[in-house]
C-alpha cells in the first residue's frame, strides 16, 4: 500500500499538471482547418467617399466639379467641426451596420467579417480633427452580433497617424508619414491597446485575428522599420502578454513569399497570417485587360500562395473590372477606364465608357457572364490556401464593390460553392 506521503505527492502533481495551461501553440485558432469566407465592413468606422458618397455630397458647392468636397475622414471632420462631425458620424455608425446585417452575412454562407477601424478611435495627435472615443463601443457591439450569428472577426487597424499609404481609406489622403517619430509612437500605443484587448479570453472565441496595419505602402515606406513593427507586435503578444491570438500582417504590396523568412515556424513563431489584397483596376494596364487576361492573373495569384511559409488569406478583393465607380480613385480624380483620371502628373486615356457601369439592367448577357466568371475564378483561386474576405459588404450606389447587390443580382454564387464556370484555373495549378 502506498504511504500517505506518496499519495499526497501524487495528488499534488496531478493538481499541478491539471492547473497548467496548454502550450500556446496548441490553443490558437487553426486556420489550416478553416476556409475563411468573409466580407469587409468598409465605410463604417472608417469613412470612404466611394462607399457612402451621400455623407460627402452635402459639401458640394456646384454641379460641375468636386471643389469643396472633403476627400477623407480627416478633412470631413475638419470641415464640420467636432460637435457637428460627432453628431453626423454617430448617426452613420448606428445605422450603416446593424444586427440585421450580421444575420444577412451569416445567411449567405459567410463565416468571417473584417472590421476596419482607425487609430483615431483610440488616441489622437494634438492637432487631429477626428471624432474619437466612440467607435470602440460600436466595434464591441459588432463582435457581439458576430458571436450571436456564428461569425468570426478580424479587427483591422486601417489607418495610422500621418497615414501609412496616402489613400483616403487610411483617414488622410496624399501623405505617408506614419513612420515619423511622433506618429510612430502614437501608433504603437494604439496597436498595443488593440492587441491586448482583443487577445483576451472574452474575445478570442470570436476575434480570430488582429491585423497590425492595413496596406502599408511598401514601395514608399522603410520596409526594415515595418518588419521591426511586425516583430515588436509579435513579441508583445506572445512574450509580454503570453497570449495566443492570431497576428495578421499585410504584405505591404510586396511579391508573394516576401515574408517567408520572418516570424516563421522554423524560427519558433506561430499563429502569423499574411494578408494579401488583389485588385486589377488601379492602372491603365489592368483596366484594359480582357476577361481571360484578368482570370489568368487570378489563377497565378492562387498558385503563388501554395509556396508561402505562412497561412495566407486574400483579405480584400472585388468583382470590379473597371474603376468607373464614382470616387473610387478619390474625390475629384476621375476614372482611368473612360480617360477622366487626373492626379498630379498622372493622366489616363479612353478604354471604354463608364455609362451604365453600375446599372445591371443595362448589361448584356456576356457582361454578366464575365463578372460571374471573374468572381468564381477568384473564389476558387483564393481558397487554394486559407480563403478570402470580399471588399466590401455593402455600398450606397456601386455594384462592382457591393457583396449584397452582387448576390441579389445573381453574380455572386449562392451557395458560395455553386459554379456556372467551373475549373477556370485547372491548367494553372
UniProtKB/Swiss-Prot annotation:
SUPFAM superfamilies linked to this entry: (Trans)glycosidases
GO molecular function: glucan exo-1,3-beta-glucosidase activity
EC number: 3.2.1.58
Disulphide bridges: 299-425, 324-354
InterPro entries: Glyco_hydro_5 (IPR001547), Glyco_hydro_5_CS (IPR018087), Glycoside_hydrolase_SF (IPR017853), Glycosyl_hydrolase_5 (IPR050386)
List of catalytic residues: 215 (proton donor), 316 (nucleophile)
Keyword Secreted among UniProt keywords: yes
Main location: secreted
Biological processes per GO annotation: cell wall organization; glucan catabolic process
PROSITE patterns membership: GLYCOSYL_HYDROL_F5
Residues that make up the propeptide removed upon maturation: 20-27
Signal peptide: 1-19
Catalytic reactions on record: Successive hydrolysis of beta-D-glucose units from the non-reducing ends of (1->3)-beta-D-glucans, releasing alpha-glucose
Name of the top EC class for this enzyme: hydrolase
Tagged with keyword Kinase: no
UniProt subcellular location: Secreted
Family: Belongs to the glycosyl hydrolase 5 (cellulase A) family.
Known function: Beta-glucanases participate in the metabolism of beta-glucan, the main structural component of the cell wall. It could also function biosynthetically as a transglycosylase.
Designated name of the protein: Glucan 1,3-beta-glucosidase
